[in-house]
Amino acid sequence: GMVGEVMLKVLAERNFPVTELIPVASERSVGKEIDYKGTKYKVVGMQTAVDMKADIAVFSAGGDTSLEWAPKFAAAGTTVIDNSSAWRKKKKKKLVVPEINASTLTKEDKIIANPNCSTIQMVLALAPLHKKYNIKRVIVSTYQSITGTGVKAVKQLENEYAGIQGDMAYKYPIHRNAIPQCDSFEENGYTKEEMKLVRETQKIIGDKTIAVTATAVRVPIVGGHSEAVNVEFANDFNVSEVREILHHTDGVTVQDNLDTFSYPMPLFAQGKNDVFVGRIRRDESQPNSLNMWIVS
């Protein structure tokens, strides 16, 4: 799938030390070949992969698959990094953003949860600021790429752009539209995506007292999520110091020069690994509050 292809691309770009690559998929894909750095690897089934006792297994196959198979890989001694939401809320499972809380991991952590994409980019900017100024509240509105929905959504946009009837990933047209629903609704009126931003932010930063409220919107963009983030701190801050802190944060690139119209945009963030932060300014309507524009 799309996510697996991008994972392989990133592993290759970063020259991740791979002795042997084991592509794993459902039975219908077993036997197919995957190209990685010029070498062909045959796709194997789940049980075969478990029996091969790999060092690391990266899961991106949905929650049900992860709940069934991640424990089997872990029992065989494999460290599982799971991209689904299946393990994120489990109290005994770590929710990890390496730049923030990788130091909490131990050899006993055999199933490691990967946070939601929109959460990762936000907490990378928030975590160092929380250490300095103590965050009280976060208000975030997201403008999320259709790639988060998958190949079907990309095809829907392409069809609508070309004026062709086809399968719909969404209940409504996405071309020239903005849909204020990412994932299904929960009983409180928020979507699952919005509640991930709430719960995961608190868990990763390690502070349940941080109040978070979110509105997640799907927009007709292919690649790159954007977020308008308002942060209220317990302590006052200096905007120049905020820029300096973010400038020295691993995984963050500050693009914030109004004289040259420099600010983050999803078009230019696509295919890059960093989180881009700009439009950094004091919220003049509320004490100790800051506005940022975060793109990744």
Question: Each predicted region: which residue ranges?
Answer:
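Helix-loop-beta segment of a Rossmann-like dinucleotide-binding subdomain
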Residues: 106-113, 177-187, 289-294
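C-terminal active-site/capping subdomain that shapes the small-molecule cofactor and substrate pocket
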Residues: 212-296
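Glycine-rich beta-alpha junction loops
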Residues: 27-29, 117-118, 142-149, 178-185, ...
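Oxyanion-binding "anion nests"
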Residues: 177-222
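N-terminal Rossmann-like NAD(P) cofactor-binding subdomain of oxidoreductases
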Residues: 1-174, 210-211, 244, 256-286
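A broad structural signal for alpha-helix termini and local helix breaks/kinks
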Residues: 133, 205-206, 233, 250
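Generic solvent-exposed, charged/amphipathic alpha-helical segments
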Residues: 8, 198-202, 243, 247
